[in-house]
Amino acid sequence: MTVRESAARTAAPSRGTWLEHEPLAGHTSWRVGGPAERFYQPADLDDLVQFLRALSPQEPLFWLGLGSNVLVRDGGIRGTVVCTKNRLRVIEARGPACVYAEAGIPCAHVARFCTERDWVGAEFLAGIPGTLGGALAMNAGAFGGETWSLVRRVLTVNRGGRTIWRAPEEFEVGYRHVQGPEGEWFVAAELELAPGDGRAGRERIKALLARRSATQPTHQPSCGSVFRNPPSDFAARLIEACGLKGHTVGGAQVSLKHANFIVNSGDATAADIETLIAEVRDRVALLCGVWLEPEVRIVGEAQA
């Protein structure tokens, strides 16, 4: 028995979902990606803690939320994928204008929860197509707001299953960047809002979503923005200036609606998308002298 086989057998959770060779195309917003060697969805936070305590320290781990902002290669992911989608969804009020939300909660749900209680400041979260855990991990933002501007404190878990409350000061936070203690993952956060007009907040959410629908390819599989905006410019402007709107590789296409989106036209592979990302980056570098940094994470094994 290999180390990984042993890890899989000893760590199989008692209450969560445990699958082997689970195709990840159904768990990513691009609708591409090979299989996870092992795939685990916790029943709740306590189940996750028990799972990690039983897991071999040699077992590779990858954390997945709604599967946006990530490109899983066609060969899939070795080790165990911990998927919080539709799990870790507890959300509750914690005192005046403070919300506790677990990592698997969609950002849009957090925004609605707050405005329903006449708390404002989180409306921009409705424009982030991912979970709170993913938003915390990269300081996701939309429409001028950034996730960590709301954070009072975060709850992390380490490989040994220990949960730790940490203050924002313990992290290096920047534009689409968060760095903290090694070997810990976000499982919840307390967010601080401001008392306000919930009805007006809901109207702002409605307006933001209408703007998003008008400017982004929301009805096609994508990961959200592919590249970070360079200083004092916009990735979409540079890509469009290079004549790349509509450019395709296989089933992957630079969106005709928003140049910083790559969409799956129906039959794209992860390899198509990765090749298109590289072609766009190289063309912008050649014609504009700007090296675009990917916002999307590219993970997993290439197809053998």
Swiss-Prot record:
Cell wall formation. Residues 31-196 form the FAD-binding PCMH-type domain. PANTHER family: UDP-N-ACETYLENOLPYRUVOYLGLUCOSAMINE REDUCTASE. HAMAP family: MurB (MF_00037). It comes from Methylococcus capsulatus (strain ATCC 33009 / NCIMB 11132 / Bath). Its cofactor is FAD. GO terms for molecular function: FAD binding; UDP-N-acetylmuramate dehydrogenase activity. The lineage of its organism: Bacteria, Pseudomonadati, Pseudomonadota, Gammaproteobacteria, Methylococcales. Its EC number is 1.3.1.98. GO terms for cellular component: cytosol. Pathway: Cell wall biogenesis; peptidoglycan biosynthesis. SUPFAM superfamilies: FAD-binding/transporter-associated domain-like, Uridine diphospho-N-Acetylenolpyruvylglucosamine reductase, MurB, C-terminal domain. It catalyses: UDP-N-acetyl-alpha-D-muramate + NADP(+) = UDP-N-acetyl-3-O-(1-carboxyvinyl)-alpha-D-glucosamine + NADPH + H(+). InterPro entries: FAD-bd_PCMH, FAD-bd_PCMH-like_sf, FAD-bd_PCMH_sub1, FAD-bd_PCMH_sub2, MurB, MurB_C, MurB_C_sf, Oxid_FAD_bind_N. It is found in: Cytoplasm. GO terms for biological process: cell division; cell wall organization; peptidoglycan biosynthetic process; regulation of cell shape. The keyword Cell cycle applies. This is UDP-N-acetylenolpyruvoylglucosamine reductase. The gene is murB. Belongs to the MurB family. The active site is at R176, S225 (proton donor), E295. It holds the Pfam family FAD_binding_4. The keyword Cell division applies. Keywords: Cell cycle, Cell division, Cell shape, Cell wall biogenesis/degradation, Cytoplasm, FAD, Flavoprotein, NADP, Oxidoreductase, Peptidoglycan synthesis.
